[in-house]
Each structure stands twice: as C-alpha cells, then as structure tokens.
C-alpha cells in the first residue's frame, strides 16, 4: 500500500539516521491527517480521530523527549562529504525537453544512479549546484552535464588541476547556456 503508516520504531530509526547525518530538526508531514483530497489517507501524527491515543502520536512524543535530552550535544554537528554530485536545474530542463538523440534519457535517473552507487557504499554525498566550491570535495561527479554554461568548463578544469577528481558521463558538454550546440568541439 502506498499510504501505509511506518512500522513501529521505523520513524524513530529514520529520525536518528537523519540526525546522525547532520540534521538539526526532524519535521513531519503531515501533522494532522487531511479530511479531503489526495492526502486524506496519508499517514499523519494526528489521525482522523483527532486524539493523542495513537501509536504514531506516542512515538513522535517519545522521540521529542529523547531529542530534547540530547539536543545540545548533537545540534550543529556536521557530516563532511568528500563527494559532491552536481545537480543543475537548467541542465535538467535543457536535457528533459530536448528531442534527441534519445527521448528516454532522464537526468534525474542518472543523478539517482550515481547517488545510489555512493549511498550503497556508505559514502556521504552532497548534492551541489554547478557554481559550488568544488575544492571542498575529493571527487565531483557531473553525470550527463549536457549544458555547460560560461565558466563551468574552466571551473571544473581548475578543480582537476588542483588535484580533484571529476567524473562525468556521456552527453556532457554538448550545449552552452542557450541550449545551442558548441561549435568547434565540445569543451
């Protein structure tokens, strides 16, 4: 089922995993279950009955008490990723709405595939914009970086010259910021 509640203890475990990765807050959607629309069967802290006498409400309350006890010890903690994966919205739009060479190529799928590789090896990853400070990372991945805007190739070259490792894949560097093909060779 798509709208099932989390299993007992699952929300707590996921919340602590989030805190362990540097989160300073745990937020819930939705607080109160909707009475209409497509979200009326989504899980929520407060069910349709409107009472605090539910397993979910009790688990959220208990988690709140636990986090209150340890809050000062974990607030502001960080997990410094050594890998950055570039996600660029303009690249997404240009690639998603191009008519070729392959209409089935999906930017987000390629990003997710790259992310999953590192995730499955328990390697922390930051999703970073195209204009990020790459020097913070040992490795920067730019899957299907179809659109290479002015200054990006130079920025990535400088990163590699300084000792960084860049991974890119097919369909990278094909067009500039106006979605026109680079003439005279790709950067």
Question: Language-model features: where?
Answer:
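Carbohydrate-binding surfaces of carbohydrate-active enzymes
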Residues: 1-187
């Amino acid at each position: 089922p798509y709208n099932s509640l989390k299993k007992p203890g699952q929300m707590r475990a996921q919340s602590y995993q989030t805190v362990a990765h540097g989160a300073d807050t745990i937020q819930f959607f939705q607080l109160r279950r909707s009475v209409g629309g497509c979200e009326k069967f989504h899980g929520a802290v407060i069910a349709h009955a409107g009472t605090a006498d539910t397993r979910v409400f009790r688990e959220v309350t208990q988690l709140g008490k636990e986090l209150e006890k340890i809050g000062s010890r974990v607030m502001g903690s960080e997990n410094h990723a050594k890998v950055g994966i570039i996600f660029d919205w303009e690249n997404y739009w240009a690639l998603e709405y191009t008519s070729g060479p392959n209409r089935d190529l999906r930017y987000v799928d390629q990003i997710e595939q790259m992310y999953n590789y590192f995730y499955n090896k328990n390697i922390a990853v930051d999703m970073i914009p195209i204009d990020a400070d790459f020097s913070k990372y040992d490795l920067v991945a730019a899957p299907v970086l179809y659109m290479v805007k002015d200054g990006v190739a130079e920025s990535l070259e400088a990163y590699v010259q300084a000792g960084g490792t860049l991974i890119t894949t097919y369909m990278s560097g094909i067009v500039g910021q106006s979605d026109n093909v680079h003439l005279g060779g790709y950067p």
